[in-house]
Amino acid sequence: MQYNPTAPGQIRESLISSINSLFACKKTSFNSPDTAFSRTRKISLVQTVLFVMTAGSGTVNNELVDFYGENSLPTASAMIQRRNQLKPEAFRELFLHFTQKAQILKKFRGYQLIGADGSRVNLPYNPSDAFSHINCIQGRKGINQVHLNTFYDLLNDIFLDAELQGIREMDEKGAFCRLLGRQKDSGRKQIFIADRGYASYNIFGHAIHNKQLFLIRVPAAFAESMYKGPKHWLEKETEDESITVHIGRRRTKKNAQLQNYHCLSKSRHYDFIEPGSDNTDALQFRVLKFPIGEDSYEYIVTNLPKYAFPLQTIKELYNLRWNHEVAYRYLKYAGNMVHIHSLKRDFLFQEIYAKLTLYNFSSFVASAVGDIKKKTKKYTYVL
């Protein structure tokens, strides 16, 4: 089922349907598959999930009053017991199940535009949690954070996929590769757009081997190091060069004969060639340079074809990446992700995936309401 953009009520029904679909995967969703949510009680599965999604910055007791009203109010301990019956994977499954129903209405020349970015989420102080606690400055109180990596539809305002990492094990590039892998069988024409924190031959290799298109901003030093040839490489103010980079792990005579050969050390990730292997890989892409101010330039690496995506189009596509930054701001503040309640790690994961689902639900409804206004030309004005 995909959403009818003219029926906001159906979006809520579809969310409820996605929540109830967790009963079909009890083993991966419930901590006690045979007994969890098997009896009719004051707090149902739907109410448990919706409470976690919509909880704001108040105490659990205050949030329960807002959610249920003062009549037939359950206790905070009863809600916690219900949440304990759910695995954090249940909320991830809900997020993906609900999101996958969405129609991709807006495209760029037939392509779905997907931004990749990460953001830190502040958590309640808990020095005993090694997963999220870190001491940033010696002698001062530490903080608790997790790193949220997401793929985001830049034109349709939807978070498509996400991966959470502890602050000590943060690896944005590794998360990008895993998220890429989960999109390769989507059946859609897609372009992945990311900032210079994702400049990596491993990422380029994953996209190229998956036959996926990408556009990634890179630091000047990275761009200039990509071609081991004449010094005039990227010397002009505006450049659009097509190059092949040969990747390997050993400095052999055979490899040295390859044009533009790059030998990667053991410490550098490249998932397609094991350290010590004689194998090589060839990656083909474009490197672009253009001015953005006086003595200031942007560098882009992409495998988009030049005939269909000239320089001006590349600039236009990259500028759309800022929609992802805006979405994170709304997710954290309007979506209350800055008000995580729990110290328990499983509950943290529940709340973060619940807020991602709430963001997408709100985006679907806003899009549907906007579509209705366009078609009816009836607008409500607040005076």
Predicted regions and their residues:
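Conserved beta-strand elements of the Class I
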Residues: Q112-I114
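Short edge-strand/loop segments of extracellular domains
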Residues: E70-S72
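Short acidic (Asp/Glu) patches
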Residues: L96-Q100, S128-I137
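Single, function-defining residue in the core of a domain
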Residues: M1-G58, D66-F67, M79-L86, E93, ...
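Short Lys/Arg-enriched helix C-cap and helix-to-coil transition segments
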Residues: A90-L105
